[in-house]
Regions:
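Short S/T/G/P-rich N-terminal loop/turn motif that feeds into the first structured element of a domain
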Residues: 1-44, 50-60, 71-110
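A short, acidic, amphipathic alpha-helical segment used as a generic capping/interface helix at domain edges
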Residues: 63-67
Length: 110
């Protein structure tokens, strides 16, 4: 889960980037859900992937769009929820984004 704060006056431009994020991500077979929610200038990207490899492929896929987004918004929080073994694969590659890692230890997925 990724949270942004959009710079003043940039919400329209950020929403246009969100449309590009969605179009690009729709092509990824390992993405199981992906959507943006808005509360004023606060934006939440809810996303889920089959595994760590799919998440890393996503970051490669949307990297250029993310760089554009970071010119008009800041990441305020990044959470990664996954089984511990998957988190182990993500800690080093995601370190620069300073995520909070949560080990999933129960529940179900359909």
């Amino acid at each position: 889960m990724l949270y942004f704060k959009v710079n003043e006056g940039q919400l329209g431009a950020f929403k246009a980037l969100c449309e590009r994020f969605v179009a690009q991500t729709r092509k990824e077979p390992g993405c199981v859900h992906y959507a943006f929610s808005f509360d004023g200038d606060a934006v939440h990207c809810r996303e889920g992937y089959d595994n760590a490899a799919a998440l890393l492929a996503h970051l490669d896929n949307v990297g250029p769009i993310l760089q554009e987004a970071l010119k008009i918004a800041a990441i305020t929080r990044l959470e990664v929820h996954a089984p511990a073994a998957e988190l182990a694969e993500l800690r080093e590659p995601l370190a620069g984004l300073k995520p909070a890692f949560f080990a999933v230890e129960g529940g179900f997925r359909r």
